[in-house]
Amino acid sequence: MAVISKKIPAPDKVEIKTALLSVFDKTGIVELAQALSERGVRLLSTGGTYKAIAAAGLAVTDVSDITGFPEIMDGRVKTLHPTVHGGLLAIRDDNEHQEAMKKHGIEGIDLAVINLYPFEEVRAAGGDYPTTVENIDIGGPAMIRASAKNHAYVTILTDPNDYAEFKEQLSADAGKTAYAFRQRMAAKAYARTAAYDAAISNWFAEALSIDTPRHRVIGGVLKEEMRYGENPHQRAAFYVTGEKRPGVSTAVLLQGKQLSYNNINDTDAAYELVAEFLPERAPACAIIKHANPCGVATGSSLIEAYQRALACDSVSAFGGIIALNQILDAETAEEIVKLFTEVIIAPDVTEEAKAIVARKPNLRLLSAGGLPDPRVAGLTAKTVSGGLLVQSRDNGMVEDLELKVVTRRAPTGQELEDMKFAFKVGKHVKSNAVVYAKDGQTAGIGAGQMSRVDSARIAALKAEEAAKALGLAVPMTKGSAVASEAFLPFADGLLSMIAAGATAVIQPGGSMRDQEVIDAANEHGIAMVFTGMRHFRH
């Protein structure tokens, strides 16, 4: 394959003599122009940026004056011109390039300050199709890429947060920038245009209902660098995609240390789970460890929901994540701080509750600003060696399913409610998952076992331990409903559930031995329903 090959010398220091400024986000642009003007730098600009700089009383030249071509088509064409791109792309130490510049009257541009139309913001706000398309920047990305390619000679700034460092460089080096800085800004510039194009590509895929586009690009903006990943020897960082889904990526950290990799992973799992329970129906609480629930409950009040969730497995809840579906109040906060907890996340937090949690300065308190809608799918992704698995989020809701009673005995009204509750929780438990529930409270949770029978046994054992801790004569699995997130392949799993005291079972169905399982349920007088929907989670 033929490739383009050209050695380009890279001078360490390049003096800024001419700058092109063309930005949508005008944060700090006048101050930057002022600093450049004071150093005698010639300023070129366009449109609104030109007006802002001129209004500040600074000498600035409109790009159309150097191109000899006016801005046309509502600003769609203004910098797409050889005079501009030649000035950005010319190799200063190449004689042919220099001759071409002289012949065509092209002036070298040493600094480009460019940022883009707010496509991502318009998309996130739900802009209509024509408006969103109109906010796709063309000239901006072209100038950014040209400047970044020629970073041996040109400094490119795409982020107002870099203006201060740039000005420090000029002050420290007599108006010059170092190659290492230009190189770093070029890398950042290409990352910016890549993310911008990814957002556009993904929006088109969504708008046209293309589930599996030929090229899938998932981009993000660095939110924070972490001390380490899942384990201390692993490096990690947190990137946000811009999806406006309330949760750990949008939450405000009201107090506490920086969230760790594991904190973020577990908090996301906890908040997505608790959002399954609509706040207008009842307060709900989910307590999570290692992305699996220790306990989940609803209650007549938020504090009761927390207490009931904690009762399911108070030992495992130590050092866990607490997610609430309603505003954290003082009474609930007072109860929570009695137990060592890593993170609390809620839609919001009262001032009184903040003051109470402040007594535990290491406890991380997050206000998410709302609850995620469990019915909205979006995308989830998982890396594998050399690839990326992408799927829609599991937005299946048991309320939307047509439940099929497959046994002679139909569930009672209370059993049906407990079935639905358990199945909701089971959706968020690592497979194989078995969840016992009674009266809007988990009684026992079995997670992540290779055998479904083992998950059922572990859940029953957890229920027995909880009963002893609470001084109960019998575990809460007695008279409970039990959910399996996938079908029961044999009757042994059902028999284990019956032995634990369950009187009603909810499962997807679909096994070759469904009838065997149904017969066993009928033999023991158990009610069982099929959902027709599986909730594997890995």
Swiss-Prot record:
Pathways per UniProt: Purine metabolism; IMP biosynthesis via de novo pathway; 5-formamido-1-(5-phospho-D-ribosyl)imidazole-4-carboxamide from 5-amino-1-(5-phospho-D-ribosyl)imidazole-4-carboxamide (10-formyl THF route): step 1/1; Purine metabolism; IMP biosynthesis via de novo pathway; IMP from 5-formamido-1-(5-phospho-D-ribosyl)imidazole-4-carboxamide: step 1/1
Keywords recorded for this protein, A-Z: Hydrolase, Multifunctional enzyme, Purine biosynthesis, Transferase
EC number assigned by the record: 2.1.2.3, 3.5.4.10
InterPro entries linked to this entry: AICAR_Tfase_dup_dom_sf, Cytidine_deaminase-like, MGS-like_dom, MGS-like_dom_sf, PurH-like
Cited PROSITE patterns: MGS
Substrates-to-products reaction catalysed: (6R)-10-formyltetrahydrofolate + 5-amino-1-(5-phospho-beta-D-ribosyl)imidazole-4-carboxamide = 5-formamido-1-(5-phospho-D-ribosyl)imidazole-4-carboxamide + (6S)-5,6,7,8-tetrahydrofolate; IMP + H2O = 5-formamido-1-(5-phospho-D-ribosyl)imidazole-4-carboxamide
Gene Ontology MF, one: phosphoribosylaminoimidazolecarboxamide formyltransferase activity
MGS-like domain boundaries: 8-158
A cellular component annotation (GO) from this entry: cytosol
Gene Ontology terms describing biological process: 'de novo' IMP biosynthetic process
Pfam families: AICARFT_IMPCHas, MGS
Similarity-based family: Belongs to the PurH family.
PANTHER family: BIFUNCTIONAL PURINE BIOSYNTHESIS PROTEIN ATIC, BIFUNCTIONAL PURINE BIOSYNTHESIS PROTEIN PURH
Entry note about domains: The IMP cyclohydrolase activity resides in the N-terminal region.
Protein name per Swiss-Prot or TrEMBL: Bifunctional purine biosynthesis protein PurH
Species name: Rhizobium etli (strain ATCC 51251 / DSM 11541 / JCM 21823 / NBRC 15573 / CFN 42)
